[in-house]
């Protein structure tokens, strides 16, 4: 097991033991000490900014991510021009793979987590829940992603990602008509919204096929940030990038920016 997984297991055990702190106090203290040591060890790895063996094995250069985007654009061009009722599920899936890769390529905006899960496509005058994420279409002005539910929402509040990228806007508009469910991403077979776990599996499928590697959202974020930091960003630019990616500059430098 990796250290983060072990730490999470121990936290879960402590929560159970805390139902009777009098009886299990010594055990709780013992596990808390183990958690502290594991966290120190995790932080040491972060401080070294070294790629783990798993990251090294699955790492791809950021230019390869962009090259794949160009390839997928070319491969799906004829499909996007086909009448919608003539598209097979396999062809729809190829279009959605292109969209998902676009969303996680960092080309249109800095890479976020699995926040597109179960995301509804809505109009700006629709009533929105404050615990769900949306793709908002506007009568005037650019559409945007409204993120109310994400890992650091508690600290950062609602986030809006305005879609300035014309190509992505056109792709989403076309895809919304093709899938016709009212959701941004779907399970093609069941026509149901894609879950966070579904996004992880979908990304794995895409990158296994094209790179023969297992690339998660977290690894994509590392690849993206490492490439950005190679451009010698100013402290202000690093802070802005961290805000866009919904974490702190410190986390970006310690956790995501990787050196060989």
Language-model features and meaning:
Residues 118-163:
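Conserved tyrosine-mediated DNA breakage-rejoining catalytic core shared by Y-recombinases
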Residues 25-85:
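Flexible interdomain linker/hinge and immediately adjacent N-terminus
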Residues 100, 117, 217-233, 241-242:
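Short, basic/aromatic-rich helical patch in the C-terminal catalytic core of site-specific tyrosine
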Residues 6, 199, 252-253:
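Helix-turn-helix DNA-binding helix
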Residues 213-214, 233-257:
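Short, polar N-cap/turn motifs at the start of nucleic acid-interacting alpha helices
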Residues 160-220, 224, 229:
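Active-site/catalytic core of tyrosine-dependent DNA strand-transfer enzymes
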Residues 1-35, 218-223, 246:
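Non-catalytic DNA-binding core/recognition domains of DNA-processing enzymes
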Residues 67-114:
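Basic, Lys/Arg- and aromatic-enriched nucleic-acid-binding interface segment
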């Amino acid at each position: 097991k990796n250290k983060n997984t072990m730490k999470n297991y121990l936290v879960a055990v402590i929560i159970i033991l805390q139902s009777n702190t009098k009886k299990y106090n010594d055990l709780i203290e013992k596990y808390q000490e183990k958690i502290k040591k594991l966290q120190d060890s995790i932080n040491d790895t972060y401080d070294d900014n070294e790629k783990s063996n798993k990251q090294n094995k699955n790492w791809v250069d950021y230019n390869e991510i962009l090259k794949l985007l160009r390839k997928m654009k070319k491969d799906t061009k004829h499909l996007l021009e086909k009448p919608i009722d003539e598209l097979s599920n396999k062809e729809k899936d190829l279009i959605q793979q292109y969209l998902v890769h676009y969303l996680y390529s960092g080309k249109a905006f800095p890479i976020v987590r699995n926040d597109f899960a179960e995301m509804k496509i809505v109009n700006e005058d629709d009533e929105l829940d404050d615990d769900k994420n949306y793709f908002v279409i506007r009568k005037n002005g650019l559409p945007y992603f409204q993120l109310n539910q994400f890992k650091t929402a508690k600290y950062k509040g609602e986030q809006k990602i305005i879609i300035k990228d014309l190509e992505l806007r056109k792709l989403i508009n076309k895809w919304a008509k093709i899938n016709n469910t009212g959701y941004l991403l779907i399970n093609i077979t069941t026509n149901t919204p894609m879950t966070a776990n579904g996004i992880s599996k979908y990304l794995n499928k895409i990158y296994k096929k094209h790179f023969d590697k297992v690339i998660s959202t977290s690894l994509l974020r590392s690849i993206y940030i490492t490439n950005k930091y190679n451009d010698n960003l100013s402290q202000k630019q690093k802070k802005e990038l961290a805000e866009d990616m919904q974490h702190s500059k410190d986390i970006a430098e310690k956790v995501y920016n990787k050196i060989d």
